[in-house]
């Protein structure tokens, strides 16, 4: 419970002049050595009707002087108990400390308010259970460098604590203390600063890390070069452009940066360096972009730097496209408004040669490729499986399929490819009924293309049809064979004609 006097003092905002000095003193509103005190709002006081002080500063001064009554008054006026403790520590007023400290209970709450390192240390000592480690940790939080300067020698040899305090200072971005620890104590894992700098995206902390590193090693040191390379890889991977530039000040290869920038589509980094590097490097980056499945914008940036000229490395490019099954660059070159570069067929040939049926079908759908082109390529490359699957999918009707396969044979020059297509036709006809016209047409087709074995097979099959018509067909085939010097076809046709003549009644 407040006394009546306390209630009056707490809520008195009136001018003190009419009250007289005696009444002011009786009310406890006189501060020895300073004069009368009057409350001004909630945060200030007026001293001797002239000076304005904040209530916290006033209670600190009163406590340092040990004026318990005035301290009590200022606390009534919403002065801070924490500042009262600080003032008592400054004046070594231990009676006041003992009286008020228990109301706070934890000295650590007061530490951030203290600027004087000596008072800071005294305050920390109020908690008798605290250790030096605790003092150092709070000194980091409150940027109290003099504590380290005073007791730093006690940390020598304690590697664990030094590392802990160093990393804590890095996390709290206390640069002054980081520098002091880094230059004056042995930190066994100095590189921890870089990991924290990356997480917090703190370039100042990052630069400070290099300053500390270079205090221990030179830029030509193998370990330093390895560290720089790792940093460049990570910074470019995360798109931290300023960090990349900072690392490059101390060494490292731009190529390291560019390959990561391509892989993770960081075009700002790429655009900064792309016009400063040789064409050979750009070509390697484009191949890497295919492997990394880079974005459309990344590809356009790379291609524009070489004016979309891919001829010098087109074989390598096609190999990469097929190997990694990523066709975006083929589309981009085809989509150019002027001077389109068509690599569809070239890539298709590689795909047909090395890829699976599903991959080829996907490519056909993507670029609207005619199945005939694929089948003919498959025939030249002896991909029997592809001929069958793609022709089956493209032309479900067997007669339609035979018709298209025959057209392909007619337009092919590759001998082995033609033979493969004709054997495929023959396999279809093995389980397909052909009428007389279809059978005769196919027989003549085999004769025209010098498919001896298939011609013989068809001749045997045709004996079930009209013999007179068959004889006429065979005479045509014999004429074709003689004209082109197809000896075996001619012999077979001649034998069949003689046999028909033999079995036909006269």
From Swiss-Prot:
* UniProt keyword Iron-sulfur present: no
Protein name as annotated: Protein MGF 505-9R
Question: In which organism is this protein found?
Answer: African swine fever virus (isolate Tick/South Africa/Pretoriuskop Pr4/1996) (ASFV)
Top-rank lineage group of the source organism: Viruses
Q: What triggers production of this protein?
A: Expressed in the early phase of the viral replicative cycle.
Keywords, A to Z, come to: Early protein
Does the UniProt entry include the keyword Magnesium?
no
What is the role of this chain?
Answer: Plays a role in virus cell tropism, and may be required for efficient virus replication in macrophages.
Its organism's taxonomic lineage begins at: Viruses, Varidnaviria, Bamfordvirae, Nucleocytoviricota, Pokkesviricetes
Matching entries from Pfam families are given as: DUF249 (PF03158)
Give the UniProt family note: Belongs to the asfivirus MGF 505 family.
